[in-house]
């Protein structure tokens, strides 16, 4: 073989990454001749020391340079070069010269694959004979491990490794002696002379190399180009369990395994995972640490509604921050993932909800089942779960860079989400029905079946003069209805706004209140050129867990030909409604906008008979394309980004009142989908996230979108939609944490300690309210105390409720910290018990237990204006009562209720709370009190009112109101201790209560 040529024909060439192609003269072609050896094609020298492993064959260079140590052979092989794998190397003793012509020896004509087979039995003594085997198949060299002399070490050259997996390994008896390619500087030799004999039935496979991530990056181009060769031939299956070459499925092709020199006798430089799904370049993410040394591979967790489709697999090492439950305590270990259920508040020690579980150490969910939603959060899928929430098989793991998931905050991929129900209903000036449970999807009473937040938009509420007068003084009957229905389900009225007949109510579970901030309302009139509020829009915006949400309830112009006017009105509403604060100024600046109401879009082109036929035959899809709103989505730029669920329910307008029949009057209005619910998620505009991808702050999934045909009080049918929100992060740290004892059995135990965060801006008008479980709004308190700022220990403060203000008897209560700046409860406790003994005077008006336990009639007298019952100076001047339940009054004559006579717990300002128990000497209020403050000696008689009260609606003489002083200290007339038919006070305690406090907020 000395005369063998080293130069191949220029016509044959090579294939990139497949090794040299066979030439016509039996020599291996190497492509373009090179006079200089490329060091990148060198691998570390083979260690020929003894090893207990199986005998393996390796392709080693011949020459004196074979003894060079591995560190001197840097850099290692990189297949990114277009040069062939087998490059001729010069020996140390000769000069580099152009390769001469090769001799005409028989050569393989295949892709250049060399199969190295192990010998059977012990190795015979080395002999000097060397034979060349003619190709048995198409250009294939079959090399046997027969006796042969070990050649002199040569400079290190590349080792040929099979690039496919389908080739069958030949039996050792069917192969001939092994050739030695001396001229080309290559030699085939045993990997180890001292290896023990091996049975012919267990040939030693050639393991694949273990490459570093930097070398694997160089292998990528060769991998792609080597696919055709790998599809034709495959070597025997590798059986080395210690080191296996994984094949990531995402690559779409097979990597070319390159056998490193000395691999059989030296340990690998990098150890890959035993899981074949993971590539050597796989690195665990920083936020998903390994929990067990026996489980180095990340378990595939269930993938429930992935937040970002462009990201990789959900991290199993991070625990999703679920919604904060009132039963969560700071002392509970982090491995408790499901708080106890709370259909009714448990009788347990009260603690303020601390920071979310996502702040605690990560707990990976079970890989075989989806992470269950805590039953106390009220956001379970209920009876109609989304298909996206079912347990899924996670895809096969692929090579993922450490920066594939940004970790500014953990992504809530397995978070059960925040559930919102939106309801719109044009009530047509009708009286409210008796029950709205099915409309609100309350789910049969279980807390987990309901929503976390409910937005209710009403249109055409009765706004006649007399009705508006009553609603100005007291809460309208529709608001009363929804508060009564939602109160037992732990819902609290967060905010409400009304513009004539358009009303928007926003409710939330009470334990979400500390994370709802920056609540603002606005309204825009569009009727009569903007001077009348029969048409227009009202909105409530707030920040929920750090995400800006906006709810917009609109009533747009009616009739078929007013589509352009509806567009103009919607643009006017969007442009005029502006909010304060850094979060979002305009409506479309919010992260999520819900737009709903009686939008009055009609069905064009089709006549009445065709529309009714499509409805009766359940062919609603024929009407979709002619719906004005659907057509406007494609043409109006103002509607860009708004989404709506499929209209799989019949048109909701117009019906005969009291029936489910469409309009049969003389007008015969054509049915239409006038009542709609749409939403829009703000497109990311802050640039890419730290991972290089666009960061999606939240994802919205609509679970249901339907009408409710069972309600027939109006000519419209109500429409409800349920949504699931998944947040990319949660701002779930309460600004104030309250702590109380397990039970208040004695008055001296009514001590409340609270801790204030440093970022919280306190006010001297902040107060702490005591609420019964099931309270309906933030002003529906039983008693309150001013939030003092005397420190007890560091940033811990303490307040005490007076014995007179505490309710008597037994019951479950909740404490809440009301912020004057935020106008909402920013801290709540768990339900706790109050068990105080009753006395003979428990029925007096100074005792709040009597008024609270007699029934909830007095609760309907609560003033529901946003600032009416807040004990702050600016709020006490507003006496526009929004108390629900006007029908519970015997007449329009206002009389002091027992709650108004209760005294200290209803004081609207600190000045009134500091009044002595004797009547203060105030000239402007003495006339209204009369002289009956002297006690029983005063002559009995009716109350003394001012002769004329122009600003107290003097047009209605039957409505008797008093003049209220600017300081909020105005009070009702004197009460008599002796029974008197004209006196409204049943006992002298009522007089003391009035002297102590004045009118309640």
Swiss-Prot record:
User: What SUPFAM superfamilies does the record point to?
Assistant: DNase I-like
Q: Where is this motif: RSXSXX motif 1?
A: 6-11
List its EC numbers. Answer: 3.1.3.36, 3.1.3.56
The annotated region (Required for ruffle localization) lies at: 724-835
Against Gene3D superfamilies, the record matches this protein to: 2.60.40.2840, Endonuclease/exonuclease/phosphatase (3.60.10.10)
Residue ranges of the motif RSXSXX motif 5: 906-911
Motif RSXSXX motif 4 extends across 880-885
Where is the stretch described as Disordered?
A: 1-130, 144-412, 837-1001
Q: Where is the composition biased (Polar residues)?
A: 1-12, 29-42, 161-174
Q: Cellular component terms, GO, for this chain's entry?
A: cytoplasm; dendritic shaft; growth cone; neuron projection; plasma membrane; ruffle; ruffle membrane
Q: Where is composition skewed (Basic and acidic residues) in this entry?
A: 284-294
Q: Name one GO biological process term.
A: negative regulation of neuron projection development
As for family, the record states: Belongs to the inositol 1,4,5-trisphosphate 5-phosphatase type II family.
Summarize the protein's role. Answer: Inositol 5-phosphatase, which converts inositol 1,4,5-trisphosphate to inositol 1,4-bisphosphate. Also converts phosphatidylinositol 4,5-bisphosphate to phosphatidylinositol 4-phosphate and inositol 1,3,4,5-tetrakisphosphate to inositol 1,3,4-trisphosphate in vitro. May be involved in modulation of the function of inositol and phosphatidylinositol polyphosphate-binding proteins that are present at membranes ruffles.
List the protein's name. Phosphatidylinositol 4,5-bisphosphate 5-phosphatase A
Q: Which organism is it from?
A: Rattus norvegicus (Rat)
């Amino acid at each position: 073989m000395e005369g063998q040529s080293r130069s191949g024909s220029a016509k044959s060439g090579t294939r990139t990454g497949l090794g040299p192609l066979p030439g016509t003269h039996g020599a291996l072609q190497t492509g373009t001749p090179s006079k200089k050896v490329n060091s990148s094609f060198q691998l570390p020298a083979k260690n020929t020391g003894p090893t207990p492993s199986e005998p393996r064959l390796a392709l080693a260079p011949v020459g004196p340079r074979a003894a060079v140590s591995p560190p001197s052979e840097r850099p290692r092989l990189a297949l990114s070069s277009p040069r062939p794998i087998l490059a001729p190397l010069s020996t140390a003793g000769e000069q580099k010269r152009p390769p001469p012509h090769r001799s005409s020896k028989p050569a393989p004509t295949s892709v250049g694959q060399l199969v190295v087979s192990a010998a059977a039995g012990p190795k015979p003594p080395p002999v000097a004979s060397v034979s060349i085997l003619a190709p048995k198949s198409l250009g294939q060299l079959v090399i046997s491990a027969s006796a042969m002399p070990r050649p002199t070490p040569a400079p290190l050259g590349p080792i040929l490794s099979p690039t496919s997996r389908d080739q069958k390994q030949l039996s050792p008896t069917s192969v001939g002696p092994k050739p030695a390619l001396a001229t080309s500087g290559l030699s085939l030799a045993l990997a180890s002379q001292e290896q023990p004999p091996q049975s012919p039935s267990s040939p030693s496979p050639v393991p694949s190399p273990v490459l570093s991530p930097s070398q694997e990056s160089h292998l990528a181009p060769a991998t792609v180009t080597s696919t055709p060769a790998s599809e034709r031939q495959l070597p025997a299956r590798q059986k080395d369990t210690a080191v296996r070459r994984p094949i990531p499925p995402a690559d779409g092709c097979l990597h070319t395994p390159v056998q490193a020199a000395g691999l059989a006798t030296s340990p690998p430089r990098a150890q890959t995972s035993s899981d074949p799904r993971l590539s050597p370049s796989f690195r665990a993410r920083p936020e998903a640490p390994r929990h067990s040394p026996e489980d180095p591979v990340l378990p595939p967790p269930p993938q429930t509604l992935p937040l970002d489709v462009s990201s990789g697999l959900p991290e199993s090492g991070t625990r999703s921050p679920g919604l904060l439950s009132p039963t969560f305590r700071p002392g509970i270990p982090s491995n408790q993932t499901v708080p106890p259920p709370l259909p009714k508040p448990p009788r347990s020690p009260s603690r303020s909800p601390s920071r979310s579980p996502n702040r605690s150490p990560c707990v990976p969910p079970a890989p075989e089942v989806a992470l269950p939603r805590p039953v106390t959060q009220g956001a379970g899928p209920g009876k109609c779960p989304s298909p996206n929430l079912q347990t899924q098989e996670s895809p096969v793991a692929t090579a993922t860079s450490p920066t594939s998931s940004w970790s500014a905050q953990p992504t809530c991929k397995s978070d059960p989400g925040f559930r919102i129900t939106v309801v719109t209903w044009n009530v047509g000036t009708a009286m409210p029905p008796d029950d709205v449970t099915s409309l609100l999807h309350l789910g049969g009473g279980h807390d987990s079946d309901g929503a976390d937040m409910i937005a209710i938009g009403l249109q055409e509420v009765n706004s006649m003069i007399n009705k508006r007068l009553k609603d100005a003084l007291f809460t309208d009957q529709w608001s009363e209805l929804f508060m009564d229905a939602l109160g037992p389900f732990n819902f609290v009225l967060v905010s409400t706004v009304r513009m004539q007949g358009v009303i928007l109510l926003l409710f939330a579970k009470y334990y979400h209140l500390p994370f709802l901030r920056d609540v603002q309302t606005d309204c825009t009139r569009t009727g009569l050129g903007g001077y009348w509020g029969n048409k227009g829009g009202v909105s409530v915006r707030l920040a929920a867990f750090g995400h800006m949400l906006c709810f917009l309830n609109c009533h747009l112009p009616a009739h078929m030909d007013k589509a352009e006017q509806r567009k103009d009105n919607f643009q006017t509403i969007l442009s005029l409604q502006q909010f304060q604060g850094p979060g979002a100024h305009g409506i479309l600046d919010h992260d999520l906008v819900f737009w709903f109401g009686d939008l009055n879009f009609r069905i064009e082109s089709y006549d009445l008979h065709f529309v009714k036929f499509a409805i009766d035959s359940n062919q609603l899809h024929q009407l979709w394309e002619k719906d004005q709103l659907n057509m406007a989505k494609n043409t109006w730029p103002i509607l860009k980004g708004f989404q709506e669920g499929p209209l799989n329910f019949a048109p909701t307008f117009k019906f005969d009142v009291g029936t489910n029949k469409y309009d049969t009057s003389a007008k015969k209005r054509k049915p239409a989908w006038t009542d709609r619910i749409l939403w829009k998620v703000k497109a990311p505009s802050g640039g890419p996230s730290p991972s290089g991808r666009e960061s999606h702050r939240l994802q919205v999934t609509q679970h249901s979108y339907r009408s409710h045909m069972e309600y027939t009080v109006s000519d419209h049918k109500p429409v409800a939609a349920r949504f699931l929100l998944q947040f990319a992060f949660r701002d779930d740290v309460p600004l104030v944490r309250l702590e109380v004892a397990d039970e208040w059995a004695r008055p001296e135990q009514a001590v409340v300690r609270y801790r204030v965060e440093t970022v919280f801006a306190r006010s001297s008008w902040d107060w702490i309210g005591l609420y019964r479980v099931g309270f309906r709004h933030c002003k529906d308190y039983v008693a309150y105390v001013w939030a003092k700022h005397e420190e007890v220990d560091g940033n811990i403060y303490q307040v005490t409720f007076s014995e007179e203000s505490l309710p008597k008897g037994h019951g479950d209560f909740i404490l809440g910290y009301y912020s004057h700046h935020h106008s909402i409860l920013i801290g709540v406790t768990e339900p706790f018990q109050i068990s105080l003994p009753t006395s003979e005077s428990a029925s007096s008006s100074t005792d709040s237990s009597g008024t609270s336990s007699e029934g909830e009639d007095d609760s309907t007298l609560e003033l529901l204006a946003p600032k009416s019952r807040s004990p702050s100076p600016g709020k006490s001047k507003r006496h526009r009562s929004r108390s629900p339940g006007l029908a519970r009054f015997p007449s329009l004559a206002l009389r002091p209720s027992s709650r108004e006579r209760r005294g200290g717990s209803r004081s609207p300002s600190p000045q009134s709370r500091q009044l002595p128990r004797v009547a203060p000497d105030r000239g402007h209020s003495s006339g209204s009190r009369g002289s009956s403050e002297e006690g029983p000696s005063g002559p009995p008689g009716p109350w003394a009112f001012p002769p004329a009260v122009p600003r107290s609606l003097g047009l209605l003489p039957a409505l008797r109101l008093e003049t209220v002083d600017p300081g909020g200290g105005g009070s009702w007339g004197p009460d008599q201790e002796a029974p008197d038919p004209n006196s409204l006070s049943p006992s002298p305690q009522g007089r003391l209560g009035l002297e102590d406090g004045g009118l309640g907020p």
